[in-house]
């Protein structure tokens, strides 16, 4: 039987592995749920890709640069996923409103709708730094 420090090392290692595998499994399961088709036959990620593809012609270089600025605080590992989610929401709004071109107002609205409330503090600070009026977005920010 195991005794002493080696027993504690093995127990610590087993607990650590279970915790790390649980955390990884949680995130993998969330991604799996987003890939599952809904009632309409498409998953959340399929719709996101659809909106990005169909609104691609509405984007210009300034909009892409502004999206890069908005996703700058996101860690590099998750930045592409964050950009895709935000761009998908902006594309959805653009297609539903049938706009001719995506403008900054639509991008801010899409960012607010696509991100959790905790990210809105960065948006407010960034918009103040760029001297953009927050008043039109107050109802969305609450």
Curated annotation (Swiss-Prot):
Compartmental location: Cell membrane
Q: Where are the transmembrane segments?
A: 6-26
Return the InterPro entries for the record: YneK (IPR020203)
Residue spans making up a coiled coil are none
What keywords are assigned to this protein?
A: Cell membrane, Membrane, Transmembrane, Transmembrane helix
Mostly located where? membrane
Keyword check for Transmembrane, yes or no.
Answer: yes
Any one of the GO CC terms: plasma membrane
The yes or no answer to whether the keyword Transmembrane is present is yes
Q: Give the bilayer topology.
A: Single-pass membrane protein
Q: How does it assemble?
A: Interacts with the N-terminal D1 domain of dynamin-like protein DynA.
Instruction: Quote the protein name from its UniProt record.
Output: Membrane protein YneK
Organism of origin is Bacillus subtilis (strain 168)
């Amino acid at each position: 039987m195991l005794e002493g420090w080696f027993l504690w090392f093995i127990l610590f290692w087993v607990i650590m592995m279970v915790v790390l595998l649980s955390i990884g499994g949680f995130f993998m399961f969330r991604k799996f749920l987003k890939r599952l088709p809904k009632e309409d036959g498409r998953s959340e990620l399929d719709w996101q890709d659809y909106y990005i593809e169909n609104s691609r012609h509405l984007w210009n270089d300034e909009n892409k640069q502004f999206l890069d600025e908005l996703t700058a605080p996101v860690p590099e590992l998750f930045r592409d996923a964050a950009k895709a989610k935000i761009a998908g929401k902006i594309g959805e709004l653009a297609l539903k409103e049938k706009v001719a071109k995506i403008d900054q107002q639509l991008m801010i609205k899409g960012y607010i709708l696509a991100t959790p409330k905790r990210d809105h503090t960065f948006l407010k600070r960034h918009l103040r730094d760029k001297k953009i009026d927050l008043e039109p977005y107050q109802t969305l920010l609450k």
